[in-house]
Amino acid sequence: MGAARGSPARPRRLPLLSVLLLPLLGGTQTAIVFIKQPSSQDALQGRRALLRCEVEAPGPVHVYWLLDGAPVQDTERRFAQGSSLSFAAVDRLQDSGTFQCVARDDVTGEEARSANASFNIKWIEAGPVVLKHPASEAEIQPQTQVTLRCHIDGHPRPTYQWFRDGTPLSDGQSNHTVSSKERNLTLRPAGPEHSGLYSCCAHSAFGQACSSQNFTLSIADESFARVVLAPQDVVVARYEEAMFHCQFSAQPPPSLQWLFEDETPITNRSRPPHLRRATVFANGSLLLTQVRPRNAGIYRCIGQGQRGPPIILEATLHLAEIEDMPLFEPRVFTAGSEERVTCLPPKGLPEPSVWWEHAGVRLPTHGRVYQKGHELVLANIAESDAGVYTCHAANLAGQRRQDVNITVATVPSWLKKPQDSQLEEGKPGYLDCLTQATPKPTVVWYRNQMLISEDSRFEVFKNGTLRINSVEVYDGTWYRCMSSTPAGSIEAQARVQVLEKLKFTPPPQPQQCMEFDKEATVPCSATGREKPTIKWERADGSSLPEWVTDNAGTLHFARVTRDDAGNYTCIASNGPQGQIRAHVQLTVAVFITFKVEPERTTVYQGHTALLQCEAQGDPKPLIQWKGKDRILDPTKLGPRMHIFQNGSLVIHDVAPEDSGRYTCIAGNSCNIKHTEAPLYVVDKPVPEESEGPGSPPPYKMIQTIGLSVGAAVAYIIAVLGLMFYCKKRCKAKRLQKQPEGEEPEMECLNGGPLQNGQPSAEIQEEVALTSLGSGPAATNKRHSTSDKMHFPRSSLQPITTLGKSEFGEVFLAKAQGLEEGVAETLVLVKSLQSKDEQQQLDFRRELEMFGKLNHANVVRLLGLCREAEPHYMVLEYVDLGDLKQFLRISKSKDEKLKSQPLSTKQKVALCTQVALGMEHLSNNRFVHKDLAARNCLVSAQRQVKVSALGLSKDVYNSEYYHFRQAWVPLRWMSPEAILEGDFSTKSDVWAFGVLMWEVFTHGEMPHGGQADDEVLADLQAGKARLPQPEGCPSKLYRLMQRCWALSPKDRPSFSEIASALGDSTVDSKP
């Protein structure tokens, strides 16, 4: 340790015990370090908050939280996310106190605690207006002091405003005083003119609240009019009479006047035209006869005493009405159960009375089948209870009725069970499952315990029979049918044996080529119910030459001669099925070789370029040229280009746009070969007018330029060739898994399309990303997106950190001037803090993807900040945050937190929007790779947008699995994606099925009861299936199962998914 400042440096002696203990203490010092500690912060009552905590330790640690020293238990409102503590809605009572993050090493027992943190919670809460002085209302007398208190409280302290009969009371008036500190209103002295309804409101930085219960102050004065009898609302049928009663008292007696809505006075001498049948009696009552619709409205009775304000009493005259009743859905009940059917009364005035009838007889209020309130109750249901029941509703306006058809279900019984069957390959096959029941039973089929969904191969008839449209060998397995009604189900199974047809596997190609004077083989294989015998013979019946052997179906030529050409027949035969033949025409050819190949050529602009190419072979090859990714058609070349008979290409008057790679393609009926070379068009140097004796000759200058250009081009070609080779190997591996004719899937998050089957644009993209290009063209390509989307970093105002992704921090910010006419825009910002080259490349690919997509259900790229480190990607954000949190909140039991519950129709709408966004993404040949509820955003209008937050480092760390040196979303990944790294649109479809499951379970963790290793083992075994969520329609669960088909070919496209969900939206009930 250094000496203290200002004192001479001298050795410091330590006691021997201290010297011995220092190494020990150093060795036992805790290895747990807090990278980020929680800090005290402001919070709003009922809003979200996050206490961040990040630790670093050599081994696994257990992180938990304390509140005032007691462990914090996870709830729907307050729960751990990674090592941080998340609050879905801050509560001032439950969250007041000191929080502390604790990290414990369960192996060593070491423990570290963070600094204390707490919330400064801002809130406001409504309360009543109460009488403070005098002690009770009975003690209030004229000319006494009256004090009222407003029981609205909050933090910070709010300001108060008092009202009498809805009119604000200003401070400083002589007849009352207001004390904001005490929240009091004092009336001194109080008189009859102070009578009225007193209320208060309070304002603070958190918001506004008004009194939950108001105070009515009534100070009597004999000269003031007082209510004796107030008019009541009246409902009458058309053309009937209506009577309103109204009386006041005062000394001296008060005056009384009636007004209709338009403020027209009603008297016996002067009646308005629309109230000619109105009569006012001496006691103040108003009679209306033969009421019509124009008489309906508000009637006011006004009493005025000698002193005091007038008293206005209102009553409304309604005409009786009744609406139609909603339709009943047919009901199916099971025998022996108890069921209820509710009849909701139609809207009407007065409220209609409701009763049930069956077979024209009104149901009693007790018994086995009876009416209770508005409900039809059927106890211990019998089959005889089936039939039509009628609900009646009636009031003064008339009567309505609606029927409900009740069916009593029975358990299905067998008419014909499925039988073990032998089905012929290639022909239709049928399995019967005939049952009867009430109502008509539903039949489903299972193949190897997997539900059979109808597609091009399977069809289930209305009677339950299963048709296999074209039986294949692998259809030989167990089949099970289940017939069910609400009363129960029955099932049976049968074994299918496929009678394999005699066939070639695969059929030999009808035309094949063999290279002259080389060894060659022509295979022929076949299968059948019995192993077939395979032999070859010449089509003319002649025997095979001695140098040609037939070995178990393989025709082997030791050395191909011209005489070996001709027609051959492969014959496969067995006893039960006879024989089949395949004819093959063999051609002997000399395979193509290039006598002259085109070379790299540099030509001055305006001169003539010659690219030589000559090929030989038998049959004689035809030569074509491809330039700049298009075939050069000799009939459309124009006057500048010409292809000679020997295959050479000449270009006259070359221009800069002629620069590029030219490919010479030689082909005949047996094979195709190609070779290519670059053409460079350069400007001719202008000679100086006077050259000194030391100036180099012109040919020397050209030689220097040629060498420089040649060296640069050679370097670029070498690097591009290496990249092309690596990518071609990767693509070839993926293409092997795809059916013939299907275009290979594009690289994940890469926008470059395939050109003529070659990934040329993709190579160019890689060049831009890895800075291989050094010229202006490469620089312009690399910065095209960033220049167009540049946004100044100084215009971003960070709000809060959402979490950490593989790239770096993800946070919310306000962007100033981002959109025209909008001062500030709420945006999501992803930062690139990683120095890993692969992650930098992924970051670039992600911004390219969002920059190119334009769809209402995909977030937009709004800007880029790349003028300094770290780089920022500015993305669109919507107000409710990610879909995962939205789903979890929707099922919360906390009344302060819970939003409106989601109906099935709304859940389907959420899934449909994600499917439409992914359809747009896949149509543009992008692959997401991390589709999940956590990576979708949702607005208050429940609009969903596909995004890529990727908070794998903290908030959603538990949803990622460390596999092969990377963090992957294991529980959302298809088998081929996790086991082979084969990501495609079909692996995104698998993840979409899991997202649908998340929506219908309100954000539960997929495979929540299993450890990550168990989920991985199930994926490897092909058994990873999620159960049907509670309340999820079977039709939608079948769609999920289609998304989880083991073969990517059997999974639907996003267009099919969007269409199926659109149909389900129509069918779904709230």
UniProtKB/Swiss-Prot annotation:
It comes from Homo sapiens. The modification Phosphoserine is found at residue 1064. One of its GO terms (cellular component) is axon. Residues 31-704 are extracellular. Residues 796-1066 form the Protein kinase domain. Disulfide bonds join 53-101, 150-200, 246-301, 343-391, 433-481, 524-570, 613-664. The protein kinase domain is predicted to be catalytically inactive. MMP14 cleaves PTK7 between Pro-621 and Leu-622 generating an N-terminal soluble (70 kDa) fragment and a membrane C-terminal (50 kDa) fragment. Proteolysis by MMP14 regulates PTK7 function in non-canonical Wnt signaling pathway. Residues 1-30 form the signal peptide. It is a single-pass type I membrane protein. Residues 794-1070 are annotated as: Interaction with CTNNB1. InterPro entries: Cell_Adh-Cytoskel_Orgn, Ig-like_dom, Ig-like_dom_sf, Ig-like_fold, Ig_I-set, Ig_sub, Ig_sub2, Kinase-like_dom_sf. CDD domains: Ig, Ig2_PTK7, PTK_CCK4. The record marks 621-622 as: Cleavage. Glycans are attached at residues 116, 175, 184, 214, 268, 283, 405, 463, 567, 646. Belongs to the protein kinase superfamily. Tyr protein kinase family. Insulin receptor subfamily. Induction: Higher expression in cell lines established from normal non-tumorigenic tissues compared to cell lines established from highly metastatic invasive carcinomas (at protein level). GO terms for molecular function: ATP binding; axon guidance receptor activity; coreceptor activity; protein kinase activity. Keywords: Cell adhesion, Cell junction, Disulfide bond, Glycoprotein, Immunoglobulin domain, Membrane, Phosphoprotein, Receptor, Repeat, Signal, Transmembrane, Transmembrane helix, Wnt signaling pathway. This is Inactive tyrosine-protein kinase 7.
